[in-house]
Amino acid sequence: MGEEGFLAHFAFSIGGLPITQSVLTTWFIMISLFIMAWSTTYKCSLLQPSTYQLLWEGVLSTMYDAIKEVLPDHVELIFPFVATLWIFILVSNLIGVIPGFYSPTADLSVTASLAMMTFLSVHWFGIRAEGWREYLKHYIKPTPFLLPFHLISEISRTLALAVRLFGNIMSLQLTALIVLMIAGFLVPIPILILHIIEAIIQAYIFGMLALIYIAGGIQAHELKSQGESL
């Protein structure tokens, strides 16, 4: 979380296209998570699981149970997306603790991309549950005059997802930087603990909101089907 790593936003450019430090860190996180996932599944064992395997199984089981509480009938479908969001955002939030690294989630373009992925996934799961004709019809029910309000709601909650995560992580890093500049390294442990706690909370909130939005589209279809069958 050093000053050089935090302020060196633009790393280099390729053909005039700027490659920022958040892009480099995002690539590093994705490659690292891929290697970790591959190494865990490659050496996994049912009879003699390693400590590393048990750790990952515990993390994934916790996320699986959390999703199951919200969408018990669709957990297998939703789990890969929401679990990936949780893990990626958590690592992205925490990596800023390491000197020389920049938290990608302190970059609005990264959080906007994550929010857009969530926006698209909500509609994809909704269309998968209802079919695209029925799904699009709910925007004009009970009256077509509600269409603008539905669209504003979809856009505003997507923007809120992006800005909330960006604002919290950016303010956290700025606060930590200011405190370290004033007090030096006399208070590194409280700042580190604050960063870790906030990183976990923000990753959890983002993933839960994405899960709730997805559940809203799927469960609306299920409630409609139950009402028609009565």
From Swiss-Prot:
Example GO CC term: the record gives: proton-transporting ATP synthase complex
Q: What GO MF terms are annotated?
A: proton-transporting ATP synthase activity, rotational mechanism
Per the record, the domain of life is: Bacteria
Q: From which residue to which does the signal peptide run?
A: none
Q: State the UniProt keywords alphabetically.
A: ATP synthesis, Cell inner membrane, Cell membrane, CF(0), Hydrogen ion transport, Ion transport, Membrane, Transmembrane, Transmembrane helix, Transport
Keyword Transmembrane helix (UniProt): yes
- Gene Ontology biological process terms from the UniProt entry: proton motive force-driven plasma membrane ATP synthesis
- Membrane-crossing residues? 17-37, 78-98, 107-127, 165-187, 198-218
Q: Which Pfam family is an annotated match for this chain, by its short name? A: ATP-synt_A
The protein's matches in PROSITE patterns, at most eight in alphabetical order, are given as: ATPASE_A
Main localisation, per the record? membrane
Membrane topology, record value: Multi-pass membrane protein
> Which Gene3D superfamilies does this chain map to?
ATP synthase, F0 complex, subunit A (1.20.120.220)
Q: Where in the cell is it found?
A: Cell inner membrane
Checking InterPro entries in the record gives: ATP_syn_F0_a_bact/chloroplast, ATP_synth_F0_asu, ATP_synth_F0_asu_AS, F0_ATP_A_sf
Q: Which HAMAP family match?
A: ATP_synth_a_bact
Q: Which PANTHER family match?
A: ATP SYNTHASE SUBUNIT A, CHLOROPLASTIC
- Family to which this protein belongs: Belongs to the ATPase A chain family.
Q: What is this protein called?
A: ATP synthase subunit a
Q: Which organism is it from?
A: Legionella pneumophila (strain Corby)
